[in-house]
């Protein structure tokens, strides 16, 4: 009735073996813990069979209808076989299934033997390695010279890198200085062009003023010629009048004193001369005032032009400074954008890695949950099997007790009363453990426990 158990302590593992008569394959999951073992039953289609013991080099099998499928109720060396089809049917073992059980037991025994031999070899190798290392110390080569050479090369590399960085900084500074000089040259060229354009404008104004001066001088000359012509005409008229008066007779008449023509002519001459002088003076004054006004306008316009040019120069300098600052801001913006893009790319890659890790962890968690559910189902199945096996054990115990009751109490005494079969103590409600039993009473036949399975 008792099954053989193996005392071992190993880690868990799995083994895939061929199936029974119907083909297919079976997965053998082994869990090595303490010193006891239990094996559940196989099931394929309508039949079921159980393996109750596994030993080193030998095995024993019996049908599920005859013996329980587990050796011990808890702990130990457990081997579970899961195949296609339902769990725990009724039937007997066939020849192929017995061969499969024999094959599995042989394989398991060989595996345990190999594990033991490998553990012994490992211990022996460790002992040999520790003893060899302690006995003979290997010579350690001297790498100090190589280290010194490496340090010198590293120092040279650092010096070269610093020199390269300094040269790069100098090149950048030279480029910036060249850009500044280029901008200054462009500003000076633009200023020279503006000054040349202003000079051309002033030349035009000077030419216009020169033309005006020439016109005024021509007008003065024409006025002088006109004055000379008037003087000449006046002299001719005076001479003609004198000639006319000289040819006449002098007649003295007692009358009012005559008018002195010479005096009148002299007065007229003086009047005309004063009038001409006034006209000349007025023309000169007008010319001088116009010239002074023009000179003042030229001076004021030149001063305004200089002030405007100074303002233009200052504005251009401000514009150049603002352009340089704008270029610096653009370069800073480009650098910040590149840094932002690099940061986004780095964090996106890190985020992708984190998401991948999260996905892996979630998949592992899902697998763990599936394993937990599967183990829970297996545990429930094993609990069901345990309950059924305890029920069968109680049934077998009742049968054995009934067989014991059938035997006579005193076999040597003569039988004077009719024999009655003695039934086993039946449980009050069910065949579960811990239930109360009824007293033995003679019955004509032995009845199994209700709810038991054969």
Swiss-Prot record:
Q: Where is region (Linker 1) located? A: 134-142
Q: Tell me the segments the record calls region Coil 1A.
A: 98-125
- Region named Tail: 404-454
Q: Which UniProt keywords apply?
A: Coiled coil, Intermediate filament, Keratin
Q: Give GO cellular component annotations, separated by semicolons.
A: cytoskeleton; intermediate filament
Question: Which PROSITE patterns does the entry mention?
Answer: IF_ROD_1 (PS00226), IF_ROD_2 (PS51842)
Write out the ranges of the annotated region (Coil 1B). 143-243
Q: Does the keyword Nucleotidyltransferase apply?
A: no
- Segments of this protein annotated with the region Head: 1-97
GO aspect biological process, one term: epithelial cell differentiation
Q: Where is this region: Coil 2?
A: 260-403
Molecular functions per Gene Ontology: structural molecule activity
Q: Which PANTHER family match?
A: INTERMEDIATE FILAMENT (PTHR23239), KERATIN, TYPE I CUTICULAR HA5 (PTHR23239:SF193)
Of which family is this protein a member? Answer: Belongs to the intermediate filament family.
Other remarks on record? Answer: There are two types of hair/microfibrillar keratin, I (acidic) and II (neutral to basic).
Q: What is the protein name given in its UniProt record?
A: Keratin, type I cuticular Ha5
Organism of origin is Bos taurus (Bovine)
């Amino acid at each position: 009735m008792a099954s053989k158990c193996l005392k071992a302590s190993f880690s868990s593992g799995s083994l895939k073996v061929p199936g029974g008569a119907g083909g297919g394959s079976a997965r053998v999951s082994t869990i090595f813990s303490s010193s006891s073992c239990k094996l559940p039953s196989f099931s394929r289609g309508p039949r079921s069979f159980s393996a109750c013991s596994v030993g080193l080099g030998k095995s024993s099998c019996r049908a599920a209808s005859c013996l329980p499928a587990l050796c011990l109720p808890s702990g130990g060396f457990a081997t579970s076989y899961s195949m296609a089809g339902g769990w725990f049917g009724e039937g007997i073992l066939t020849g192929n299934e017995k061969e499969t059980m024999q094959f599995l037991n042989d394989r398991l025994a060989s595996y345990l033997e190999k594990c033991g031999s490998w553990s012994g070899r490992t211990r022996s190798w460790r002992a040999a390695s520790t003893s060899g290392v302690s006995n003979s110390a290997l010579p350690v080569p001297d790498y100090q010279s190589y280290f010194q050479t490496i340090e010198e090369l590293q120092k040279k590399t650092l010096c070269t890198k610093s020199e390269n960085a300094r040269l790069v900084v100098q090149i950048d500074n030279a480029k910036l200085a060249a850009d500044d000089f280029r901008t200054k040259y462009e500003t000076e060229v633009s200023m020279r062009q503006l000054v040349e354009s202003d000079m051309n404008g002033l030349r035009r104004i000077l030419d216009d003023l020169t033309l005006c001066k020439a016109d005024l001088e021509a007008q003065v000359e024409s006025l002088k010629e006109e004055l000379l012509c008037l003087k000449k005409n006046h002299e001719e008229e005076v001479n003609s009048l004198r000639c006319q008066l000289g040819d006449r007779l002098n007649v003295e008449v007692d009358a009012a004193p005559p008018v002195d023509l010479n005096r009148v002519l002299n007065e007229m001459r003086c009047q005309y001369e004063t009038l001409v002088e006034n006209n000349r003076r007025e023309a000169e004054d007008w010319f001088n005032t116009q010239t002074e006004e023009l000179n003042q306008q030229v001076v004021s316009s030149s001063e305004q032009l200089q002030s405007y040019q100074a303002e233009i120069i200052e504005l251009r300098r401000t514009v150049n400074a603002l352009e340089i600052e704008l270029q610096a801001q653009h370069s800073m913006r480009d650098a910040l954008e590149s840094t932002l893009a690099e940061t986004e790319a780095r964090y996106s890659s890190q985020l992708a890695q984190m998401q991948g890790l999260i996905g892996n962890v979630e998949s592992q968690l899902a697998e763990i949950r599936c394993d937990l559910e599967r183990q829970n189902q297996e545990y429930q199945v094993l609990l069901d099997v345990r309950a059924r096996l305890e029920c069968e054990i109680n049934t077998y115990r009742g049968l054995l007790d009934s067989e014991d009751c059938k035997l006579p109490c005193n076999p040597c005494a003569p039988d004077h009363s009719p024999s009655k079969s003695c039934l086993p103590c039946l449980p009050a409600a069910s065949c579960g453990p811990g239930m109360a039993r009824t007293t033995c009473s003679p019955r004509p036949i032995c009845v199994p426990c209700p709810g038991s399975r054969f």
